[in-house]
């Protein structure tokens, strides 16, 4: 509409986090109730509120509830958060951490367990249910999982209810290994542990996976028809996802798509005109979109940029389909691709660093006759690992660069099939061995403390955690902490030029990972974007880029951690920027180090 307006339809609701319009009525999931709202007299307002089902609440702030999703028999599916008491806790009220089914008569029955913060739940055109998950305890990074009856999605706390009548499983908390190995290792021992269909690498593909919708009509262009769009609350953006089934199991790849929404993007819905509506909030959690709430819509412009449209797993690597024919001279060069694989730890701790990272050599490259498909034959495709695929140097035939140069493929299964016959493909090139500088051994990145900084040698003298031996004492001691919402608790610090500074950074009042980086005046955006471009390798550098704009920094600190650094204040007076360069944080988390004479 050229003149959009709001109209009150229903009131007195308790934290509605899900709506669905079905057969003439709105169904709302409140914190503790599934409510059917009907306008019986046609005046534009609900006049009949029907309690379809309700459930226990303890009163913990984290007991969010989501849905409903309808199946063909009018059953409704809901997902429940675990409570948060410093860790995810399901035992405070029944069925927390579960997906449940509500029949048309209101009967509630459990379906699947292991959920932590399942903000999005949807059923695709094939009738399969997926849910979105947020990083936290037992969840190394954001992810999307296909749920079926009896599945355990990973959060062990929910298993406290597995012995209840109606439970489709008998798995116990004590059955779940808690040894920080990758999740697929635990799945070898816990047979109903469901691996994610697609991992969303934390910070690189958002920080708070929220909702997902399927584009069955090609609303965002014909190349993306049948794919999915996923929202992220913390990074205020939409990402794109392609799924395929290998050996009966979903897997696929996620790509960046559209950033810059005005607030935290929580809900997605298609409009009648094919536009994508986004419902937004930043209540309680910060977001890169600075508004507290909002409603926006996105329309396809009618033009498709040069992108990776699809990536398919092959028996010996991956095949990339581009939206436009490639320039063969760039697509045939192995140096124009970076392929890395990595994983996350599965444990009760909050989140996970990247582990078992490996750079892959390209053995051969095959280009289709129409120049739209490029097949990469790798030294190894690692089953159960996330593969970062970056054809960053490939151009379209018209010279156009990729709008988004990275995708993250979750390889749950390697498809069977014949390996490529290079001799029969006129556009096949056997790739030469990469130069020594491009050969990387598998580098475990299990800490983000001192060892990571030592690898980042250009920055090593910018990160001193012991007082220099020639100092008798610091001239000034500074302390800066964090507050919820991706903010430092101090926005300005003042020091004299050339003074000896002891600075302690306390990451004690937020539940996110942060660092503290002091940079040249006016360069916070530049340094923040450089940190983001490091990709998966950034975690071993604490997301501090090798830049002469970086003056001093801490390493990445997990929640409840502190670090002290020592430095001499710049000799030139000015307002030096303090910024967190953890991807997605640099636009919000800032301060000023004011240097005076």
Question: Each predicted region: which residue ranges?
Answer:
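Surface beta-strand/loop "capping" patches
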Residues: 301-328, 486, 494-497
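N-terminal edge beta-strand
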Residues: 302-303, 471-501, 509
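Beta-strand cores of secreted/periplasmic/IMS beta-sandwich domains, seen most often
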Residues: 1, 491-518, 563-577, 593-595
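Beta-propeller domains with acidic blade repeats across secreted/periplasmic ectodomains
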Residues: 1-305, 310-314
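Acidic, Ser/Thr/Gly/Pro-rich low-complexity segments and short DxT(G/T)-type signature motifs
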Residues: 302-307, 327, 391-455
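Extracellular/periplasmic metallocenter environments
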Residues: 454-465, 548-597
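Short, surface-exposed alpha-helix to beta-strand junction/turn motifs within ectodomains of secreted
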Residues: 323-364, 389-395, 405-409, 518
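Extracytoplasmic beta-sandwich strand-turn segments characteristic of Greek-key/jelly-roll folds
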Residues: 352-369, 523-571
């Amino acid at each position: 509409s050229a003149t959009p307006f709001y109209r009150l339809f229903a009131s007195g609701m308790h934290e509605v986090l899900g709506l669905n319009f079905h057969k003439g009525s709105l169904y709302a999931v409140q914190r503790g109730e599934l409510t059917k709202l009907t306008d019986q007299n046609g005046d534009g307002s609900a006049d009949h509120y029907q309690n379809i089902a309700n459930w226990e609440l303890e009163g913990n702030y984290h007991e969010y509830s989501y849905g409903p999703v309808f199946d063909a028999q009018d059953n409704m599916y809901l997902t429940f958060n675990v409570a948060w008491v410093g860790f995810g806790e399901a035992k405070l009220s029944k069925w927390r951490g579960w997906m449940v089914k509500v029949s048309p008569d209101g009967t509630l029955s459990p379906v699947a367990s292991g959920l932590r913060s399942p903000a999005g739940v949807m059923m695709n055109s094939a009738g399969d249910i997926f849910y979105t998950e947020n990083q936290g305890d037992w969840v190394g990074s954001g992810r999307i999982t296909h749920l079926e009856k009896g599945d355990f999605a990973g959060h062990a706390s929910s298993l406290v209810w597995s012995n209840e009548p109606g439970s489709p499983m008998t798995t116990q908390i004590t059955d779940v290994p808690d040894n920080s190995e990758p999740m697929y290792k635990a799945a070898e021992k816990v047979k109903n542990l469901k691996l994610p269909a697609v991992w969303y690498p934390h910070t690189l593909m958002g920080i708070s996976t929220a909702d997902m919708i399927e584009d069955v009509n090609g609303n965002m262009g014909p190349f993306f028809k049948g794919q999915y769009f996923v929202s992220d609350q913390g990074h205020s953006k939409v990402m794109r996802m392609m799924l395929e089934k290998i050996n009966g199991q979903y897997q696929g790849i996620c790509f960046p798509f559209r950033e810059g929404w005005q607030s935290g993007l929580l809900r997605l819905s298609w409009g009648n005109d094919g536009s994508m509506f986004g419902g937004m909030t930043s209540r309680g959690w910060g977001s890169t979109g600075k508004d507290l709430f909002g409603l926006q819509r996105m329309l396809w412009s009618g033009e498709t940029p040069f992108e990776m449209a699809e990536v398919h797993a092959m028996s010996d690597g991956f095949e990339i389909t581009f939206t436009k024919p490639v320039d063969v001279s760039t697509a045939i060069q192995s140096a124009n691709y970076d392929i890395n694989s990595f994983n996350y730890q599965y444990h009760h701790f909050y989140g996970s660093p990247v582990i078992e990272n490996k750079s892959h050599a390209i053995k051969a490259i095959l280009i289709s006759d129409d120049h739209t498909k490029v097949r990469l034959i790798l030294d190894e495709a690692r089953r159960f690992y996330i593969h970062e695929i970056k054809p960053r140097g490939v151009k379209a035939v018209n010279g156009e660069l990729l709008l988004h140069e990275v995708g993250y493929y979750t390889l749950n299964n390697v498809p069977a099939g014949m390996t490529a016959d290079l001799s029969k493909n006129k556009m096949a090139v056997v790739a030469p061995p990469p130069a020594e500088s491009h050969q990387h051994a598998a580098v475990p990145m299990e800490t983000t403390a001192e060892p990571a900084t030592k690898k980042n040698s250009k920055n090593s003298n910018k990160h001193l955690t012991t007082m220099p031996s020639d100092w008798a004492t610091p001239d000034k001691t500074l302390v800066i902490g964090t507050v919820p919402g991706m903010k430092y608790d101090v926005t300005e610090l003042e020091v004299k030029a050339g003074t000896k500074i002891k600075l302690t950074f306390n990451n004690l009042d937020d539940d996110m990972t942060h660092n503290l980086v002091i940079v040249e005046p006016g360069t916070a955006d530049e340094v923040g974007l450089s940190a983001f471009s490091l990709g998966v390798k950034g975690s071993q550098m604490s997301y501090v880029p090798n830049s002469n704009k970086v003056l001093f920094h801490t390493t990445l600190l997990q929640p409840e951690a502190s670090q002290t650094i020592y430095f001499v204040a710049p000799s030139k007076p000015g307002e030096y920027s303090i910024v967190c360069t953890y991807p997605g944080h640099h636009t919000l988390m800032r301060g000023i180090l004011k240097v005076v004479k």
